[in-house]
């Protein structure tokens, strides 16, 4: 076995990067199954960044690459484009430039490595959910290779059982980024099958296979859901983090909560409405009062200093096609006009109407909180209707959670007061009752006898 310190360091670096990449893929798989589209976008960006950093390290000169000579440099130059995720279209990217007009599969695989390496096969298992990366000794080729490192990725899409044909398959230009990940990694596996392995040996024997299973944040026992939940406001998974993200289900959600409620952030926007029950919003408010980051920003005076339709920097009002409701979430200090249980109103300086008018107060005994509902009185001209919901908890009045709702109405806005459909009919009815009462014979009176 080689005791070269730089090779040992390189081996550990590769192991850590593979471990991190595998964990992010597990989170990506879980987010895809649970339909968390916001999480998918951020995870895809993180995976893309990790791969670009890895690509930069591969192409950077190092003592190990200089020892291996020009062969490995040529291999890395051919391998680096496979890690590029920012190509506009795979069908027109530089991946096809190596094949020529009529690509020959055998010739293409031979061009990736020197002739003296072509007889050596890269140890690779079928891509059925587990992939392995073999590292052999490049400096001491006569010594025996240690135990292979197997990195099993159980969370990967099992439908990918074989690599697509690199030369014949054509990708459409509207592939989503997750499909491009699957395709690119399948191509990498196919090219590594036809190329030599980079021989880097560890200085110590590995007792057990370094097999990765789905992280505990993806698979949890049912009893864990009865304990504390993830502090991210729209996540219902249990909090099973470690180190700095103890209050979250994963380090990804911890980072997401920290980024999305940072100062200066616009309110949380949800086209189509917020499909969460009120108890989860109360939980988010309670976690905020406990000093946790929940992914909802603080926006002081967002709906009290001016009308929401005049605050374009906070509330984006361009609805998408077919959208009938849009909601925003943010924290703010409770206003004095909302403290009383009586129905009150709060005027707005840029609106001639009465402003926000309280319509309902709901006590949430199980959650030890309350919810107040407001409507804009009167509603502004046009098809839009504005509603505001305020959530508070009994143990703290430091802040309140506000949910602002924009709803597309049917154009028929009726006043909130109860008005009779036909006032004339009511008047005639009352007059009829009075007439009947007046027609009744009066009791006889006794006259004085003369």
Curated annotation (Swiss-Prot):
- Molecular-function GO terms, alphabetical: sequence-specific DNA binding; zinc ion binding
Task: Tell me the function of this protein.
Answer: Transcriptional activator acting positively in the phytochrome B signaling pathway. Functions redundantly with VOZ1 to promote flowering downstream of phytochrome B (phyB). Down-regulates 'FLOWERING LOCUS C' (FLC) and up-regulates 'FLOWERING LOCUS T' (FT). Binds to the 38-bp cis-acting region of the AVP1 gene. Binds as a dimer to the palindromic sequence 5'-GCGTNNNNNNNACGC-3'. Interacts with phyB in the cytoplasm and is translocated to the nucleus at signal transmission, where it is subjected to degradation in a phytochrome-dependent manner.
Q: What is known of its domains?
A: The VOZ region includes a DNA-binding domain and a dimerization domain. Contains an atypical zinc-finger followed by a basic region structurally related to the NAC domain.
Q: Where is this region: Disordered?
A: 91-115, 339-374, 411-450
Zinc fingers (C3H1-type), as residue ranges, are: 230-253
Q: Which GO terms describe its cellular component?
A: cytoplasm; nucleus
Location of the region described as VOZ in the Swiss-Prot/TrEMBL record: 221-418
* Induction line: By far-red light. Down-regulated by far-red light (at protein level).
> Where found?
Cytoplasm; Nucleus
Instruction: Give a yes or no for keyword Nucleus in this entry.
Output: yes
Q: Where is the composition biased (Basic and acidic residues)?
A: 95-105, 355-371, 419-429
Domain of life according to the entry = Eukaryota
- How is expression of this protein distributed across tissues? Ubiquitous. Expressed in the vascular bundles and mesophyll cells of various tissues. Expressed in the root, especially in the root tip. Also detected in stamen filaments, stipules and anthers.
Q: How is it modified after translation?
A: Phosphorylated.
Q: Identify the species of origin.
A: Arabidopsis thaliana (Mouse-ear cress)
Q: Which residues bind Zn(2+)?
A: 230, 235, 249, 253
Q: Which gene encodes it?
A: VOZ2
This chain's protein is named: Transcription factor VOZ2
Documented effect of changing residue 230 to A: Reduces DNA-binding ability
């Amino acid at each position: 076995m080689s005791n070269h310190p730089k090779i040992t360091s390189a081996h550990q670096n590769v192991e850590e990067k593979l471990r991190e990449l595998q964990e992010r893929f597990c989170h990506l798989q879980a987010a895809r199954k649970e339909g968390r589209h916001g999480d998918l976008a951020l995870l895809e960006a993180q995976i893309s960044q990790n791969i670009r950093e890895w690509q930069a390290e591969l192409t950077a000169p190092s003592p190990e690459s200089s020892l291996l000579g020009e062969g490995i440099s040529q291999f890395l130059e051919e391998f680096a484009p496979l890690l590029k995720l920012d190509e506009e279209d795979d069908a027109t990217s530089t991946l096809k430039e190596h094949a020529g007009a009529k690509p020959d599969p055998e010739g293409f695989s031979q061009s990736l490595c020197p002739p003296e390496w072509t007889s050596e096969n890269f140890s690779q298992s079928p891509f059925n959910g587990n992939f392995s990366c073999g590292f052999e000794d490049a400096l001491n080729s006569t010594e025996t290779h240690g135990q292979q490192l197997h990195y099993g990725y159980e969370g990967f899409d099992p439908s990918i059982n074989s690599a697509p044909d690199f030369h014949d398959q054509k990708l459409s230009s509207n592939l989503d980024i997750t499909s491009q990940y699957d395709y690119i990694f399948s191509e990498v596996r196919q090219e590594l099958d036809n190329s030599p392995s980079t021989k880097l040996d560890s200085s110590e024997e590995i007792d057990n296979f370094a097999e990765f299973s789905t992280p505990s944040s993806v698979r949890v026992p049912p009893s864990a859901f009865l304990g504390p939940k993830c502090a991210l406001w729209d996540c219902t998974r249990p909090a099973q983090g470690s180190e700095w993200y103890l209050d979250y289900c994963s380090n990804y959600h911890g980072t997401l909560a920290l980024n999305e409620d940072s100062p200066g952030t616009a309110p949380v926007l949800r086209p189509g409405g917020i499909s969460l029950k009120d108890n989860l919003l109360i939980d988010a408010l309670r976690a905020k009062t406990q000093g946790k980051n929940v992914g909802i920003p603080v926006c002081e005076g967002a709906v009290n200093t001016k009308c929401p339709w005049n605050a374009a920097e906070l509330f984006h009002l361009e609805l998408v096609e077919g959208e009938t409701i849009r909601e925003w979430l943010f924290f703010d200090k409770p206003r004095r006009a909302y403290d009383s249980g009586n129905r009150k109103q709060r005027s707005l300086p840029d609106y001639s109407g009465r402003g926000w008018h309280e319509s309902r107060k709901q006590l949430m005994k199980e959650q030890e909180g309350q919810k107040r509902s407001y409507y804009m009185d009167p509603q502004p001209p046009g098809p839009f209707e504005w509603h505001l919901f305020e959530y508070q908890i009994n143990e703290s009045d430091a802040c309140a959670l506000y949910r602002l709702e924009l709803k597309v109405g049917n154009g028929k806005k009726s006043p909130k007061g109860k008005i009779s459909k036909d006032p004339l009919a009511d008047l005639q009815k009352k007059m009829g009752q009075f007439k009947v009462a007046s027609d009744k014979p009066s009791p006889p009176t006794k006259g004085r006898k003369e």
